[in-house]
Amino acid sequence: MKILVAGPLGIGKTTAIRTLSEIPTLHTDEVMTDAAASADDLTLDGLRGKTTTTVAIDFGRLTVPQAKVVLYLYGTPGQRRFLPLWEDIADGAIGALVLADTRRLDQSFEVMDLIEERGLDYAVAVNTFPTSPDYTLDTLRSKLDLDKQTPLVTCDARDKNSTLDALIALTAHLIARAGDESP
């Protein structure tokens, strides 16, 4: 099953896939050029000092033996200029794990809009950083304007158990939605 890992630039998508994958990940991080640095606002909190960016995809795999399921994790670029590639990567996905950062919540709306336009179900995982403001899940749900059915969790993309919990929230949601749509 194909799962998107999406979110804005510098949110932890590559880290999350590397953390979860049981195989060496495919990643297409490249050094940011002056042109890319001027196109992306690297002065925002959480982006200062960023020197690389994903220019195509990240890919990893996670087998869930108990469910006899293999999850193929596809990380999408976080910049609008990669939208055509993003759309190609999204083809065939059954859902998305959207990563968000409380320092830049407004940047998550564009990604959630793209996912909703494609008709994909998703969960939101707020990736925690040392300098991130701390909000309750209810406050985050309100700030992100999420439906009550949309799973919302916090995670640390560097921590396997934490990131796995976020992926479990998404897959449980997808299974429940599939059951709702059964005749």
Question: Where is each model-derived feature located?
Answer:
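Conserved G1/Walker A P-loop phosphate-binding module
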Residues: 1-47, 62-65, 70-72
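A structural signal for isolated positions on well-ordered beta-strands in alpha/beta enzyme cores
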Residues: 4, 123-124, 153
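A short hydrophobic beta-strand->loop->alpha-helix junction that borders the nucleotide-binding pocket
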Residues: 6, 64, 76-77, 103, ...
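Conserved catalytic network of the ASCE P-loop NTPase/AAA+ motor domain
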Residues: 54, 63-66, 87-92, 114-119, ...
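Switch II (G3) loop of P-loop NTPases
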Residues: 66-84
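Conserved C-terminal guanine-recognition region of P-loop GTPase G domains, centered on the G4
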Residues: 99-149
